[in-house]
């Protein structure tokens, strides 16, 4: 959503906290906001509601909102978050082992993915589609809400966990193609936990 830089954000109702889907009980939402998966990563910004009005999200730390979560305004009213339909791939496998293999290849490329019992859902990328089809997957283009699995480090806070490792391996596949992986990650090896 594009806003005029001269917008007076103080006139917008402020959302100051979040309730996870199902935590609101029977309290009805006074409004809804339909957001794509990348728009659901919020800390401080204006969000347009389905009725055209706006609220200022002003949270103490970044959060990744899920479909059905609620933004809680200062006056106690709730805004329900709806995951917007997005252009995604519906990826199917021959069996559970094949689905696990496909998930590994997707994860190895650090792609956001929705993981379900019988399919994987990712944002469209023609290069990844070709790779998956080359691995025997059935890939369909669909439009639906994208609800990726939240990673181990997506909780909105940092414990300072650290490790160092590198991947520098070459291997070949039974189908005659070979390629290498070479990338590294390094982090400070100190764990910092300040708990009072």
From Swiss-Prot:
GO terms for molecular function: nickel cation binding; unfolded protein binding. GO terms for biological process: protein folding; protein-containing complex assembly; urea metabolic process. NCBIfam families: PRK13261.2-6. It is found in: Cytoplasm. Keywords: Chaperone, Cytoplasm, Nickel, Nickel insertion. The keyword Chaperone applies. It comes from the Bacteria. Involved in urease metallocenter assembly. Binds nickel. Probably functions as a nickel donor during metallocenter assembly. GO terms for cellular component: cytoplasm. Disulfide bonds: none annotated. HAMAP family: UreE. InterPro entries: UreE, UreE_C_dom, UreE_N, UreE_N_sf. Residues 156-196 have a biased composition (Basic and acidic residues). Its main location: cytoplasm. This is Urease accessory protein UreE. Belongs to the UreE family. The keyword Transmembrane helix does not apply. Signal peptide: none annotated.
């Amino acid at each position: 959503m594009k806003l005029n830089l001269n917008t007076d954000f103080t006139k917008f109702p402020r959302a100051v906290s979040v309730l996870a889907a199902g935590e609101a009980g029977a309290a009805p939402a006074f409004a809804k906001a339909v957001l794509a998966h990348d728009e659901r990563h919020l800390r401080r910004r204006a969000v347009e509601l389905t009725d055209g009005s706006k609220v200022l999200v002003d949270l103490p730390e970044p959060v990744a909102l899920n479909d059905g979560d609620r933004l809680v305004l200062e006056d106690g009213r709730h805004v329900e978050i709806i995951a917007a339909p997005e252009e995604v791939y519906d990826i199917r496998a021959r069996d559970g082992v094949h689905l696990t293999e496909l998930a590994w290849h997707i994860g190895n490329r650090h792609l956001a993915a929705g993981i379900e019992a019988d399919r994987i859902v990712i944002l469209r990328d023609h290069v990844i589609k070709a790779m998956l089809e080359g691995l025997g997957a059935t890939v369909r283009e669909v439009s639906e809400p994208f609800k990726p699995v939240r990673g181990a480090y997506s909780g909105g806070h940092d414990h300072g966990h650290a490790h160092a490792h590198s991947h520098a391996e070459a291997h070949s596949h039974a189908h005659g193609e070979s390629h290498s992986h070479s990338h590294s990650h390094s982090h400070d090896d100190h764990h910092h936990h300040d708990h009072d």
